[in-house]
C-alpha cells in the first residue's frame, strides 16, 4: 500500500502535488482551529454554567435575606407591647374601648406592613377569631386553610412557620402564634400571618445578571413548590430526577432542552432551581459556531481555488519549458532557437525560460563557431605539417654536420652541433609544460655549451644540482631564460670575465634554486623585461605561482658592482597535483 501511494505521488504533476499539499495544510489547519474553537466554546460554556450556579447562589442568599427580614417583622409583631396589651383586653365588653383598640391595632399593623417591600398583607387573628389585617392584597386561601395554618403554627409554640398554600399558583405565608409574655404566662393570644409577595421579590433579584438568570423555582423540604414561574412549571420534577446533588445539568422535557442549576440551602432546607431554556442561553454561541464554521469553509474553498490558480501559474511555464525541451530532443537545436517561451515573470520559472532561451541560442552559436574552428584547425594542422618539414630538415642537416666534424676531428664543432641539435630536438618534441629539474638542467647545460664557444674564457659557468632534487618538478624553460638574462646583462656589455652559477638544493621542505652572477648588478625593472629576446622574469614568476600557488615564486637581489642573485622557491614534488 505504501509503495502504491509513493508511486502515485511520484507520477503526479507538480501542480497537483502543490494542490494536494495545500489541501492537507488547510485540512489540518481546519482541524486545529475547529478543535481550538470547540475547546474555547467548551470553556466558555463551563464559565456560563458556573456563573449560572453562582447567580443562583447569590439569588438564594438575597431571597433568604428578605425572608429573614420578614421573620424579624413577625417577631416584632408578636412581641409588640401594645399589640400584646390590645389582644389581652379583647375580652372586655366596652364597645368604645374595643373600637379604639381595633384602630390602634390596624395602625400598628399598617406600620409594620409598610416597613418591608415584599409584604403583601399582615393578618392578626385574636383568640375569639376576630381578624385584623393591613396591606395591599390578601389571598382567599388564608380563609380556606386557616384551621390548618393555626394547627401547624400552634405546634411551633411561637417560632416562625413558613407555609405554602395552594397548588399551581402557591402563596407563601409566615405564621406565628402570639403568646402572652406578661408574667411569663405564655397564654395564646392569637395568630399573626404575613403573606409574602414572592413574585416581586424574585423579579427584583436578578436585574443585573443578564442571561444567566432564567426562571427561578423554589421548593420546600417536602418538595412542594414555594415559587415557580408559569412558563417552566412543568420542569421541577425532571430537575429533581436529574439533579441528585447540587450542580448543573441539561435536561429535555416535552421536546425542549433546559439548562438547570440547582442548590439546596441550609435555611429551611429549601431547594433552589434556575431554569433557563437552552436556546435562550446558548443562541448566541450556537450562532457564532455556525458563523465561524461557515466562514472557515468559505475561506477553505477560496484558498483552494486561489491555490489551484497559483499552482497553475507556477507550473505552466515549467510545462511549456518541458514541451520546448521535447521539441529540441526530436527536432534539434534549431527548433529550440525558434521557440518563443514566456519570460514576463521574474520568478524562478521565468528565469528558467529565459536561461533556456539564452542557452539554446548560445549552443547554436557555439555549434556554428565549432564548425568554423574545426575548419580552421584542419587548415592549421595542414600548415603545421608543412611547417615541421623545415625544423626536421635543419635537425637532419645538423646531424650531418656533426658526423662530418667528428670525421675531421673537429671536437668543438661537434659539441656545438650536438648542443644545438639537443635544443632544437627539445623544442620540437617536448610538449610538456612541467619537467624535472634534471631535464631543465640539461637544457641549460647545452645552452651554456654553445655560449662557451662564443665567449670562450670570459664565461665561467657552474651547475650544481643535488641528487635529492633532480626529480622534482619545475615549469619548463625556467632556468634557461635566467641564464640567458645573466649573459645578456652581466657578460655581453663588458670585456671582463663573468662567472655564472646555478645551484639547486633542498631547504625547509622546499627546493631552493639560485642563479647568480658577479656582474655589475642591474635594476630589477630592467631584468623584468626581456628586450624581445626571450621570457621575462615576471612571466617566470607568474608561471610558478599559477603552477604551485602564491607562497612560491621568484626573488631578485642585485647590488651595484657586486652582481645579481635570483632565488626561485618551489615545492619538492615528484608529480603534478
UniProtKB/Swiss-Prot annotation:
Gene Ontology MF annotations: ATP binding; phosphorelay sensor kinase activity
Residue intervals on the Cytoplasmic side: 1-17, 308-577
Main localization of the protein described in the UniProt heading: membrane
Gene3D superfamilies: 6.10.340.10, Histidine kinase-like ATPase, C-terminal domain
EC number in record: 2.7.13.3
SUPFAM superfamilies recorded: ATPase domain of HSP90 chaperone/DNA topoisomerase II/histidine kinase
Membrane topology label: Multi-pass membrane protein
Entry-linked SMART domains: HAMP, HATPase_c
InterPro entries xref list: Bact_2-comp_sensor_kinase, dCache_1, HAMP_dom, HATPase_C_sf, His_kinase_dom, Sig_transdc_His_kin-like_C, Sig_transdc_His_kin_internal
Catalytic activity: ATP + protein L-histidine = ADP + protein N-phospho-L-histidine
Gene Ontology biological process terms from the UniProt entry: signal transduction
Residues annotated as domain Histidine kinase: 365-574
Residue ranges, Extracellular side: 39-286
All copies of domain HAMP, residue ranges: 312-368
PANTHER family from the UniProt entry: SENSOR HISTIDINE KINASE YPDA
Function, in words: Member of the two-component regulatory system YesM/YesN. Probably activates YesN by phosphorylation.
Record-given protein name: Sensor histidine kinase YesM
Taxonomy of the source species: Bacteria, Bacillati, Bacillota, Bacilli, Bacillales
